[in-house]
C-alpha cells in the first residue's frame, strides 16, 4: 500500500500514523491530527491531560513523528499544537440547530474539535475556535511556528469560531479547497 501511495502522490516517502481522533465520522482524517508546515517541519495535536478523550492518540502521533525521518533520512522538527482544554460537546440547542436527517455525532460524544484543522492561505492561517480557554493559545502557537519556520510576519494567523462546522463532522480545512496563487 505504501509504495502504491508514494507512486500515486509522486512522493518519496509516506509517514503513517496509527490512528486519528475520529474513527467514526471521518475515519480519522490526518488534517485533525498533524500537518506539515514546511519540508521537515510538522505540527501535531497535543494534550497533557490523561483524562482527555484523545490523549492516547495525541501521544501516539507525536511519538510516531518524533521518531520519523524525511525521505532523505533527516529527523523531523515536531511542534505541539494544544487541543482545546475541555473536550467540545454539543448542547441540546446546538444539536437541534443542525438540519440533518441523521446527525453525525451524538450529544454525549466529544466533537472532533482540533485546532489542527485550520486553513492555510497564501499568507495566513484561519484557525478554528471553540469558545475555549486554549483558543488564543492555539492561534499564538501557530503564529510562533509559522514565524520561526517562514520568517516573522510572512503569515498571519487568526481565529474564527467554527463550532457549527465541527458539529457537522469536519472543520475549516475539511470544508475548503485550498489553491495557492503560485
Where on the chain are the PLM-derived regions?
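Histidine/cysteine-enriched polar flanking segments
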Residues: 1-182
Amino acid at each position: 500500500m505504501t509504495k502504491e501511495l508514494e507512486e500515486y502522490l509522486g512522493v518519496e516517502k509516506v509517514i503513517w500514523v496509527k490512528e486519528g481522533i475520529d474513527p467514526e465520522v471521518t475515519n480519522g482524517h490526518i488534517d485533525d491530527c498533524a500537518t506539515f508546515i514546511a519540508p521537515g517541519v510538522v505540527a501535531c495535536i497535543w494534550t497533557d491531560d490523561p483524562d482527555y478523550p484523545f490523549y492516547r492518540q495525541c501521544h501516539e502521533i507525536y511519538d510516531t513523528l518524533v521518531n520519523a525521518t524525511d525521505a532523505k533520512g533527516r529527523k523531523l522538527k515536531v511542534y505541539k499544537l494544544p487541543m482545546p482544554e475541555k473536550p467540545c460537546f454539543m448542547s441540546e440547542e446546538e444539536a437541534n440547530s443542525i438540519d440533518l436527517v441523521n446527525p453525525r455525532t451524538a450529544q454525549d460524544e466529544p466533537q472532533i474539535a482540533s485546532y489542527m484543522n485550520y486553513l492555510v492561505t497564501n499568507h495566513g492561517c484561519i484557525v478554528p475556535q471553540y469558545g475555549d480557554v486554549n483558543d488564543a493559545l492555539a492561534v499564538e502557537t501557530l503564529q510562533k511556528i509559522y514565524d520561526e519556520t517562514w520568517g516573522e510576519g510572512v503569515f498571519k494567523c487568526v481565529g474564527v469560531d467554527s463550532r457549527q462546522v465541527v458539529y457537522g463532522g469536519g472543520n475549516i480545512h475539511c470544508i475548503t479547497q485550498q489553491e495557492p496563487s503560485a
